[in-house]
Amino acid sequence: MRHTWRWFGPVDRVSVQDAAQAGAHGIVSALHHIPTGDVWPVDEIGKRQEEVRAGGLEWEVVESVPVSECIKTQTGPWREHVANWQETLRRLSAAGIRTVCYNFMPVLDWTRTDLRWTARHGAKAMRFDRIDFAAFDIHLLERPAAHEDYDTATREAAERRFREMTEERRLALSRNIGAGLPGSADGYSLPQLREHLRTYDGVSREKLQRHLVEFLAEVAPVAERTGINICAHPDDPPWALLGLPRILSNAEDYAFMLREVDSPANGVTLCTGSLGALAANDLPAMTRQFASRIHFVHLRNVLREEVRTPCSFYEDEHLEGDTDMVAVIAELLQEEQRRRAAGRVDHQIPMRPDHGQEILDDLSRGAQPGYPAIGRLKGLAELRGIERALSHATYGLSAATR
């Protein structure tokens, strides 16, 4: 696999040189300062490339070109935004970039109730607590239909939890849930979040699925002509939140998307952490099912704290948690072998160690939530070790089949 590292630009406290020292081959980045829906300027794309090259690596994957809420709801200037997305693909292709990640999550990107929860050994990790989330939804956000989305036991537990919360914890919970895209300074206040939720009134799961397919029908041909692989990131977590539909949460969702827009450029961002929060998702089987259309990989592990859906979970160490990471990597390596045999130019799949616990000097250094230097370095080293062992000529996968 092609080992990559997410970098949020010059504001990132972890440098490109740090990434190179950690063993990364390339950088994953985006132009977070460009307003969603606008075309990315050629000079800004070139500037980011030069910033990355100054650290000794190349910008190889875009994560993400945001999809505007106008596109998702098909309201306002959504057609203009689709045209701008197409033009951005052309410009990225002209700059030599071949992989573009995006997501179709309405309003909220990844959602956590704690950004620096204390895990074992004193490490800090991100966590989703379903009772805290219900307390936020019912008692802080005061969403009109919130009570209907939770069973009696959850509502009662949420009410107790809310009463026990300090005002400081209530404010922190609102900030954590209302945080914007990683790398973005944008976030939602409670009034802003209520307003954004109202824009999805009447947008059913089926309607949002149709909007995704219609969006892909416009952009996938451009991606195919320009030699770019576009890859949809799964919902995080993979279940409905705040009454909003989720449409990329399991194998059935991805099979529908790939079947409806059957272009080799239209593919999957395999995020084992996002999909792994849902116990029904068999990650090695999903990797095998969608192998030929996996264009980008996020390797991360979560530990589900309950046998139910939705559940509370936290981001565990990369080789711990509920996902069999060795099996997933084995499937990916076998797919790379098939691609080489078929002569595919994209035979090497870009992968990044997704998130990481804050450990050692991370705890005092500070970083974008989920993106500390040492926690990710440790994760990448462990993942690279699995890959190296499975690829060994004498003791690896190929030897086992002889």
From Swiss-Prot:
This is Mannonate dehydratase. Its cofactor is Fe(2+); Mn(2+). GO terms for molecular function: ferrous iron binding; manganese ion binding; mannonate dehydratase activity. It comes from Rhizobium meliloti (strain 1021) (Ensifer meliloti). Belongs to the mannonate dehydratase family. Catalyzes the dehydration of D-mannonate. It comes from the Bacteria. NCBIfam families: PRK03906.1 (NF003027), uxuA (TIGR00695). Pfam families: UxuA. Pathway: Carbohydrate metabolism; pentose and glucuronate interconversion. InterPro entries: Man_deHydtase (IPR004628), Xyl_isomerase-like_sf (IPR036237). Keywords: Iron, Lyase, Manganese, Plasmid. Its EC number is 4.2.1.8.
